[in-house]
From Swiss-Prot:
Protein name: NADH dehydrogenase [ubiquinone] 1 beta subcomplex subunit 3
Database matches in Pfam families: NDUF_B12 (PF08122)
Modification N6-succinyllysine occurs at: 23, 34
Species in which this protein is naturally found: Homo sapiens (Human)
Processing after translation: Methylation at His residues by METTL9 enhances complex I-mediated mitochondrial respiration.
Subunit (UniProt): Complex I is composed of 45 different subunits.
Amino acid sequence: MAHEHGHEHGHHKMELPDYRQWKIEGTPLETIQKKLAAKGLRDPWGRNEAWRYMGGFAKSVSFSDVFFKGFKWGFAAFVVAVGAEYYLESLNKDKKHH
């Protein structure tokens, strides 16, 4: 059965990033490689961990980053909810419930 009209179902070659873009120079991995070299050893897979020290991954996450991540939007939603509650309560204030 032939696939027609652009129904390829995602069966195409995956694009992989070039391994040479990841460098260990200037990262803690460089120190590890030097310590291993002093013992006559080498980590051939060290470059595979270099991405952890580049770009957005380079910044370590602090407790306050985790705790306050959605705080401003959560607080805004809280203020809107409280405002709506007071507004609806003021509409029903004239009606007395027995």
